[in-house]
């Protein structure tokens, strides 16, 4: 706990030699704190992975063993599984710090709060997004996806899962402190996740049809860049409103 408190102080109070806050140091301090906290609750990470595996594994059992059909639905199933899995950890992105008053301390720190939110978003992706990217090719084998499709799946998820975390941070901030926040969060985010789902799964569908899929990846990348600049300050503003 002392190590965690120390990294929080580092995240909130890092200063340059002339007394100016160092946002990059604060972001890294927040990232380290979030990862240390994750080590104390490994079961939550396992829950995300188990849920992803279950979603991806139940569809072949329900659809049947026909290879052509499995290859057709595989990318969409894996994308839906990744989308739903990222939702599981979003309520805790700000919820626990809101409950114990830590968010108020962060707001009082000299570091721009958006940078601290950025550290939380990166930590969420490393814990709930990156493992899904690494696991997706293994699950893709049960759908009979060829190596080229598996490689494209990984590339699309590398663009799409950070986007899901960024958009999810806004939703988590907007529902902070509300009753039934988990259900409200899902209702709020699922429509916003649709473009990422369409472009991510569409890239693999285009590849399977022999069409150019670069446009889908370009759109995913453009959405990711826009979200990287907009999501942290928007989420920070929403958290500030919820606390004040």
Where are each of the predicted segments found?
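Hydrophobic alpha-helical transmembrane segments that constitute the membrane-spanning cores
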Residues: 47, 118-143, 163, 167, ...
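Aromatic- and glycine-rich beta-strand/loop motifs that create alpha-glucan
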Residues: 2, 18-48
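A structural motif at transmembrane helix-loop-helix junctions in multipass membrane proteins
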Residues: 151, 156-190, 240-244
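Transmembrane helix boundary and interhelical loop/hinge segments in multi-pass membrane proteins
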Residues: 38, 87-107, 120-121
């Amino acid at each position: 706990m002392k190590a965690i408190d120390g990294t929080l102080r580092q995240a909130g109070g890092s200063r340059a030699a002339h007394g100016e806050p160092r946002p990059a140091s604060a972001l890294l301090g927040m990232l380290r704190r979030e990862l240390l906290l994750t080590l104390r609750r490994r079961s939550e990470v396992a829950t995300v992975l188990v849920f992803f595996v279950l979603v991806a594994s139940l569809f072949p059992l329900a659809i049947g063993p026909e290879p052509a059909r499995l290859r057709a639905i595989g990318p969409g199933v894996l994308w839906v599984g990744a989308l739903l899995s990222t939702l599981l950890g979003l309520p805790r992105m700000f919820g626990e710090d809101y409950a114990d008053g830590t968010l108020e301390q962060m707001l009082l720190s000299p570091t721009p709060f958006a940078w601290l939110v950025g550290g939380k978003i990166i930590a969420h992706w490393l814990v709930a997004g990156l493992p899904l990217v690494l696991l997706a090719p293994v699950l893709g084998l049960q759908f009979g996806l060829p190596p080229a499709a598996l490689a494209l799946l990984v590339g699309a998820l590398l663009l799409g899962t950070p986007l899901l975390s960024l958009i999810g941070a806004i939703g988590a901030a907007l529902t902070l402190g509300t009753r039934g926040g988990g259900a409200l969060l899902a209702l709020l985010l699922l429509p916003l996740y649709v473009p990422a789902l369409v472009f991510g799964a569409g890239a693999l569908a285009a590849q399977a049809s022999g069409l150019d899929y670069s446009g889908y990846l370009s759109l995913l990348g453009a959405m990711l860049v826009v979200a990287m600049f907009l999501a942290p300050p928007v989420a920070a503003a929403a958290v500030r409103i919820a606390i004040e």
